[in-house]
Amino acid sequence: MKKIFTPFALLPLSLVGLLGNNIAVAQTEQVKTTKQTLNLPAPNLDASKNRFSKVIGWPEGKTPVAPAGFTVTKFAGNIKSPRNIYVLPNGDVLAVLSNSERSTKEQIANVISGKAKSEQGGESANAIILYRDSNKDGKPDLQSLFLSGLNQPYGILVIGNTLYVANTDGVVTYPYKTGATKITGKGKKIAALPAGGYNNHWTRNLIANEDNSKIYISVGSGSNVGENGMENEVKRANILEINPDGSGEIIFAAGLRNPVGMAWAPGTKKLWTAVNERDKLGDDLVPDYVTSVKKGGFYGWPYAYFGQHEDPRMAGKRPDLVKATLVPDIAVGSHTASLGLAFYNGKKFPAKYQGGMFIGQHGSWNRSELSGYKVAFVPFKNGEQAGPMEDFLTGFIADLEKAEVYGRPVGVAEMKDGSLLVADDVSNTIWRVAAK
């Protein structure tokens, strides 16, 4: 797919330089707040091991497991690869259906390596399904094809009478009316983005600020660690900022290898994102993380990781950027593929969870033992982390020794009734977690 870039003239001067020339520990120790010391192992280029999970699907009647006091039910099924979930202002639920599209050569290689068994394959559905629960019983009584003919969509946003959809190659707007079950108007592309990306870095997410005056777009890298040349990473590994009409594009934050989930911490103006860090430095490097994002901030990729730890593959190339690298807020485990992100704003969950953060961890492949494959929770109070990360929704791993999994969680979203929805792309399911 053709890559379209905007001129450097659109970028703030503080970041033009960043992009023109383009930072032994157990997994359980990688969930501390980084206000504490995080002891990382030395990078080892020879220690990297691949272990792809094998998806076997959920047996009839079996569900993921939530803590005591919660119920888990199937909200929707038999839909191909639900990756993201967006709850409309009127309570309708949009499920974004999309998956990686592989060339014939890639498909053959993935069969040989075992990767094909761990992901949703074939042609992407490239569609959005609408669900409506009219009688509020936790089960949708209406399902409608809301929008189709998209290009690997992921992010959705509604501002007034405008629907925004982030395809892999750009942001498109459509006329929208509250209560509509199908989009019939023609789309208008308002922002071009570089398409595709390394591994599964084709997702583009969207979020607006409180007064809807700015929109933020997450864009992942085109490589693991810049191995294809930084000239191929323009507008990548960033969170971009635009006006609602697509104008005024700037790079809001850079050096974020693959930022996917984005959310505002309740009661604050802090934008948080979930970031997938780099591969092939060993089982316990580099920790994925969630972090609040500072305007103009640089978070290391590809030169440094988790603060000013220089990547040996980029040694000596940009010591200035290594020095400028910010330390992320919360480590969430290496290779966990932490993608989904949502803060809980409701009152139906116990007080412990109110205001807290939920993280959809899609699960590892570049690690000798599986990590992730769960929804994690981080308690927050007054918009700040108030305790260590803990498991919330588990049971996705069927057999750790055989690396068999029932499913893989991705997007997370809170419904208007205070329940939590979890997209499980490889099992074609959306789960609903509700307090008893």
Language model segments and positions:
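Beta-propeller domain segments
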Residues: 28-67, 104-105, 203, 221-227, ...
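A detector of repeated loop/turn-to-beta-strand junctions in beta-rich toroidal repeat architectures
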Residues: 124-127, 140, 168, 184, ...
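Residue position within the beta-strands of beta-propeller blades
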Residues: 94-96, 165-166, 216-218, 272-275, ...
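Short loop/turn segments immediately following the C-termini of beta-strands
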Residues: 90, 98-100, 168-170, 176, ...
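Beta-rich, blade/repeat-based domains predominating
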Residues: 79-90, 148-162, 196-214, 254-270, ...
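Blade-level signature of beta-propeller repeat domains, shared across WD40, Kelch, NHL, RCC1
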Residues: 413-436
